[in-house]
Amino acid sequence: MASRKTVNRRQRPQRATSNVFAMFDQAQIQEFKEAFNMIDQNRDGFIDQEDLKDMFASLGKEVTEQFIDSMINEAPGAQPINFTMFLTLFGEKLTGTDPEEVIRNAFQCFDEDNSGKLNEEHLRELLTTMGERYSEEQVDELFRDAPIKGGQFDYVEFTRMLKHGTKDKDEA
């Protein structure tokens, strides 16, 4: 009887992690798969301590064993991370970002007519001159896939894109 409960407990998290695929669209899952494959240096289908060390080394970063262990320990059971667990961990991290309302409110501070849109050039100026300043190249990159029509940056749609991904594959 106790072993049956143990088996059931192990199955529940598996079902929960498989639902992670519903959190992302196909394009996002493909991007995560590419990232996973880049980290999985030995191509065994799992990310382990050695894969993480190799990845950081390839980026020119020196990290401690404790840092690597803390990353692996984020996975339940502190075992090598398969793709489903990788997606689950990213899903948890992404849901840990600011809620849509908080992001939208940050933009809304500059939206004098409460239209949900900001003038593209005005936003560019704000991003390059205030707070943590962005370079022109960074702003260009940000604006590349941003919802801008008629010189108006739609921050409501942009916030949705940040939290839920783009729909450009569906619209094409």
From Swiss-Prot:
What are the GO MF terms of this UniProt record? calcium ion binding; myosin heavy chain binding
Indicate where the modification Phosphoserine is found in the sequence.
Answer: S18
GO cellular-component terms in the record? cytoplasm; filamentous actin; myosin II complex
> Which tissues and organs express this gene's product?
Expressed in the spermathecal and uterine walls. Weak expression in gonadal sheath and intestinal muscle. Not detected in vulval, pharyngeal or body wall muscles.
The PTM entry states: May be phosphorylated by let-502 or/and pak-1 and dephosphorylated by mel-11 to regulate its activation and myosin II-mediated contraction.
Q: How does it assemble?
A: Myosin is a hexamer of 2 heavy chains and 4 light chains (two regulatory light chains and two essential light chains).
> What other remark does the UniProt record contain for this protein?
This chain binds calcium.
Domain EF-hand per the UniProt entry, residue ranges: 27-62, 98-133, 134-168
Q: Knockout consequence? A: Arrest at the 2-fold embryonic stage which is associated with a defect in embryo elongation and failure of seam cells to elongate to a narrow morphology. No abnormalities in body wall or pharyngeal muscles and in the number of hypodermal cells.
Annotated Ca(2+) binding lies at D40, N42, D44, D51
A Pfam match is: EF-hand_7
PROSITE patterns xref list? EF_HAND_1, EF_HAND_2
Single Gene Ontology BP annotation: embryonic body morphogenesis
> What InterPro entries does this protein's entry cite?
EF-hand-dom_pair, EF_Hand_1_Ca_BS, EF_hand_dom, Myosin_RLC
This chain's protein is named Myosin regulatory light chain
Q: Main location per UniProt?
A: cytoplasm
| Described purpose of this protein according to its UniProt entry | Regulates myosin II activity and organization during embryo elongation. May be involved in the organization of mlc-5 into bundles. Required maternally for cytokinesis during meiosis and mitosis in the early embryo and for the establishment of embryonic anterior-posterior polarity.
Keywords assigned: Calcium, Cytoplasm, Cytoskeleton, Metal-binding, Motor protein, Myosin, Phosphoprotein, Repeat
Compartment(s): Cytoplasm; Cytoplasm, Cytoskeleton
User: From the record, what ranges are coiled-coil?
Assistant: none
Effect ascribed to mutating T17A: Partial defect in embryo elongation
